[in-house]
Amino acid sequence: MSITRPTGSYARQMLDPGGWVEADEDTFYDRAQEYSQVLQRVTDVLDTCRQQKGHVFEGGLWSGGAANAANGALGANINQLMTLQDYLATVITWHRHIAGLIEQAKSDIGNNVDGAQREIDILENDPSLDADERHTAINSLVTATHGANVSLVAETAERVLESKNWKPPKNALEDLLQQKSPPPPDVPTLVVPSPGTPGTPGTPITPGTPITPIPGAPVTPITPTPGTPVTPVTPGKPVTPVTPVKPGTPGEPTPITPVTPPVAPATPATPATPVTPAPAPHPQPAPAPAPSPGPQPVTPATPGPSGPATPGTPGGEPAPHVKPAALAEQPGVPGQHAGGGTQSGPAHADESAASVTPAAASGVPGARAAAAAPSGTAVGAGARSSVGTAAASGAGSHAATGRAPVATSDKAAAPSTRAASARTAPPARPPSTDHIDKPDRSESADDGTPVSMIPVSAARAARDAATAAASARQRGRGDALRLARRIAAALNASDNNAGDYGFFWITAVTTDGSIVVANSYGLAYIPDGMELPNKVYLASADHAIPVDEIARCATYPVLAVQAWAAFHDMTLRAVIGTAEQLASSDPGVAKIVLEPDDIPESGKMTGRSRLEVVDPSAAAQLADTTDQRLLDLLPPAPVDVNPPGDERHMLWFELMKPMTSTATGREAAHLRAFRAYAAHSQEIALHQAHTATDAAVQRVAVADWLYWQYVTGLLDRALAAAS
């Protein structure tokens, strides 16, 4: 029985719009059960084929050339049946997974509504409040609960999208074959805390259906060899219908926790706290830890009694249509949609969630997209919409201002430095290219980045607070996504977006919690004065990725984060940006759209300077250099003592020009123009460093020179590889 929609005087306001999952979890459980029955029939046929193969060909009844050919053909059919078993296991576990997600979301939302309703009852009976105060308090509570429910629906939609490339758990096939019939779902009836809920365990009566084949089944196995009756002798197998009750025991945490939330009405201000039934998203039991989950789970005696009866048409019934099994993407083929077609996942997200929009399919040049994915994963899917997609979308709608981010020579704020040591700094050296800044999979970005270091708008802070308790049940995943959303909002703040044509940031988070960012300008470009938090990676400055791969993604930040994840063998969970920035791209994963009130007034973040991000060894060397030895890091001063003419405004305008084009190959023109700007900025920084009289100003100029030296060298290598 599916979880019903909460009722109450304020329930509708807490649920509409977009605060309730309209999908029916029982539909998915029923489909999983139907496919489980198909799996049992396929397994019966498979066991019969194996038995007959061993009896005829291995028992010596038939030998010779014709026998070998027939043996090979039958072996091929057996392999096909095993493959079909794997497909069915994928479909069954996916349907149960989606049903569990829907169940969990509904029960969490029910908890929120019930807790808020109890708090409202307290407020309505509070004699210390006047009518206006009571009305205001109730409205704020209803609004906060509605926001939490909408966020839960959005989070569920994201997790449904993540299941596009669903892979069944280990030993899933063995577990399914041991059940004989799928276990009834454990439905957490948190919404209506009535004592009638224990009646749900009565559903295991359905396992009685496997008992019906047992009387007729032993009759047919007697026909083969005397050893065959051993299979019918497993009348102990009827006990296996009891095993659906045992899978219920791993799921006991789900019904147990529903009882506690209604009893404990404490802290209803954060109605998401009772959300503890986390085991529900994975309803499939895993009691049998068999070691090998591959496509050879040979369980000869599983459905023995009913198997040998009719190997051709099991049960005499029309064979169910099992085409949906092929729709589940195979684990080894994640990138079949890279040619520009639409990618069909097993389900669609709830489009009522305002903050998550399903990834739209868009035309992508197949060759270019495939070239951007060095490891063969689905990196290019829709990442670059060829000619018609204005990749200068997002911030690209701003009018060209012709203003370059010019750094003045009287900067007073020095970058964060460690205490200078007394040693003599070595002479200037070329930028290091051997530094490999690989993502640390052992800890995600949220483990090392305090949220207080990221600016956040009041509206976003309120939403995060409302959903904090609900996300606590999956601590790492929720925190990483919440942190990534805040970073994306800060990068889109007005003080981080100077209105340069086509310049915008994209933020992505992986399934293991890593956060990577990319922008549409140059390579390793970070605007002056901007800092990135620790454990946040810049895709175009990754030393491990070949420079030609990085260059292919220039001006296309969505493609850049996809290529970064593919190179490091990671899976993207979501891509975050504004609606305009994500409109013409298909990242192949969930899109999280930033709302206008998500973006803070200031995007100033505390973390690493741009030199520390792109060249950590040079930043460390600069920090260890005393003020008296700063010039040792630079080449000799130019012979001409006159300052070079500052042409950065015009050069910046030139690098913006390619961003107005949607033609293929605009990235090469942009990189050439950006290289000219970087070289000129390096020349100006060198002159400023040699002529500065203040140590703080000189240190800033040296940092600028080291940064632009690195960027110039990177662009030189990229352009050389492209030519």
Swiss-Prot record:
InterPro entries tied to this protein: ESAT-6-like_sf
UniProt superkingdom: Bacteria
Keywords (A to Z) from UniProt: Cytoplasm
TM segment ranges: none
Protein localization: Cytoplasm
GO cellular component assignments: cytoplasm
Compositionally biased spans, kind Low complexity: 200-209, 230-249, 309-319, 393-404, 412-426
Compositional bias segments (type: Pro residues): 210-229, 250-265, 274-308
Record keyword Hydrolase present: no
Region (Disordered): 175-360, 393-451
Basic and acidic residues: bias regions: 432-444
Function: May act as a chaperone that facilitates EspB secretion through an interaction with EccCb1.
Entry protein name: ESX-1 secretion-associated protein EspK
Species name: Mycobacterium tuberculosis (strain CDC 1551 / Oshkosh)
Designated gene of the protein: espK
